[in-house]
Structures are given as C-alpha cells and as structure tokens.
C-alpha cells in the first residue's frame, strides 16, 4: 500500500479530535513552560495571555480556511502548528525583552512603560522575521499559481494570513495584556 486516503465522516471526526487533543496538550505544556521561564514578569498570567494570543491565531487560520472554502485536512493542521510555532516564538522574544528590561531598569519604569519599550525594541526583529517568511510563502504561491498546483495553495494562502495574525497577536495582544 503506497498511499491511502479515507474520507468518510467518521475518519474526519477522528482526525479533528486528534488534532484538537494535540493542540490542547501543547497549550497546557506551553502555559507551564512560560509560567516557569517568565516568573518575574507574571508567570502564569504571562502564559495565559500567550495562550489567548495563540487561540486568536488558531481562530484566524480557521477563518481563512472557511472564507477560502479550503478543506479542513492535514494542510490545516500543518498551517496551525506552523503559525503557532512562529507566534509563540515572537511572543517569547517580547517576554524575554520585558524580563531583561525589568532586570535592567528595576522599578524605575511603570509596567506600561516597560512593556511599551520592550515591544518597541523587539518589533523590528519580529516584523523582519515575518516578512522574510511571508516572502518565501508568497514565492510558493506564485509558483503554484503559474504551475496550477492548487493543493499547496491551501497551505500557502492561510499560512501567509496566519503569519501576519501571529505577529500582530505577539506584539499587540500577548505583550500589552
């Protein structure tokens, strides 16, 4: 057997439930990790706010799939996991900058000023990383459009939207909250 695709309603439901369990399990581990790593800047609340941003990202990727009428399949799971990885990486960069600035400036800055300064310091890095990745995904979109390969487009289009939403949520949702 070289390849098999089972597309009945039962297998679709099973696939969705397995994906949901995998994402929920990763969310729990993520909150625990952030709670320990960033104890000085809020710990558990930092983990919960990072999770809020990630749920936002998952919803946005899902919305793109629905809007474009793409099937919820393995591409969906790949896009969600990739966007979550990118988004949490950007969030951790912001949190790390907040922690470093807290150590550097102590209590001389208000929390609002500290977060604002930290986001300002990390925005260029986050945007540049996202733009670089988005250009690579855009190149894939162009080549797929020219060659008529639609299967990869169901990955590339939601991926671009997810990258943009993930960067937004890292800078504008998880940090300020």
What label would you give each PLM region?
Residues 1-177:
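A structural signal for conserved, well-ordered secondary-structure elements
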């Amino acid at each position: 057997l070289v390849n098999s695709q089972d597309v009945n309603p039962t297998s679709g439901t099973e696939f969705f439930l397995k994906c949901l369990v995998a994402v929920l399990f990763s969310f729990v581990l993520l909150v625990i990790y952030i709670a320990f790593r960033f104890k000085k800047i809020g710990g558990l609340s930092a983990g919960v706010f990072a999770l809020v941003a990630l749920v936002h990202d998952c919803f946005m990727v899902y919305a793109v799939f629905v809007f474009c009428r793409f099937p919820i399949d393995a591409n969906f799971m790949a896009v969600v996991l990739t966007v979550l990885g990118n988004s949490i990486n950007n969030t951790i960069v912001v949190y790390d900058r907040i922690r470093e600035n807290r150590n550097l400036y102590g209590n001389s800055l208000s929390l609002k000023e500290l977060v604002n300064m930290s986001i300002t310091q990390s925005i260029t890095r986050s945007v540049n990383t996202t733009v670089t990745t988005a250009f690579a995904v855009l190149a894939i979109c162009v080549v797929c459009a020219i060659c008529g390969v639609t299967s990869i487009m169901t990955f590339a289009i939601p991926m671009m939207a997810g990258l943009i939403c993930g960067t937004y949520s890292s800078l504008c949702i998880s940090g300020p909250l």
